[in-house]
Amino acid sequence: MPVSHSISPSPAMIHTADVLCVRDLHFSYPDGHSALHGISFKMNNGEKAALVGPNGAGKSTLMLHLNGILGGHGEVEIGGKRLTRDNLPAIRAMVGLVFQNPDDQLFSPTVFEDVAFGPLHMGLPEEDVRARVEAALEAVRMSGYRDRLSHHLSVGEKKRIAIATVLSMNPSLLVLDEPSAGLDPRARRTLINLLRELPITMLVSTHDMTMVKELFPRTIVMDEGKIVADGSTPEILDDEKLLTEHGLEKP
């Protein structure tokens, strides 16, 4: 059964070609470790891209810059709006970041309260909040879970609820860190089908190269804080020398 398309990018984004634009982004941690070196790339409206590379490549660090959790030197734009301290709340509503561990995202007693948290803090009327929650739960095929206790769910169910918590904000860009990690085959397949059907621009960091091959038309390869390749997924996966040099395996 296809998911509902009631979850869609915010109206301001529909006519914007570049949903995401990163220009010459550099970042070093307080201990002096340099994690990002001149990262630049764009994503178009509706595009789905995989972000791959070995552990320590800088993938998670990059993702934490896209909604302002970390702030380096360079520029990040979402829908033509540059990320600054003044517009940080608006940017965070536009960028739905889903962490690898769903327990980092689910902290309310019930599923409904978790998914409603963002819209409530936007100051929306109760009726609008309920509508957003129902649409988000329907989109991740969890409509019957609204009154369940979040901490009693399976890992796969928690990951879908974590996605719903950001979908309820009607984001323009969905950013996921290792979404298939720790899932059994059935839960993994359910997740892949969900990501395929969601009508939203998507950047997904993953080591699951089989999912990359199946789901993403574009693949960005990172290593040592740099983008070392960016192209069509078939071309990237056919380049065995590239994969070997950067610790990746052909699916």
Residue ranges: model-predicted function:
Residues 212-214:
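A short, surface-exposed alpha-helical micro-motif characterized by mixed small hydrophobic
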Residues 74-83, 91:
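Conserved ABC transporter NBD signature motif
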Residues 226-248:
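Conserved beta-strand-loop-alpha-helix hinge in the C-terminal portion
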Residues 127-145:
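Conserved ABC ATPase "signature" region
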Residues 149-153, 157:
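Conserved ABC ATPase signature
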Residues 206-207:
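H-loop/switch region of ABC-family ATPase nucleotide-binding domains
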Residues 174-177:
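Catalytic Walker B motif of ABC-type/P-loop ATPase nucleotide-binding domains
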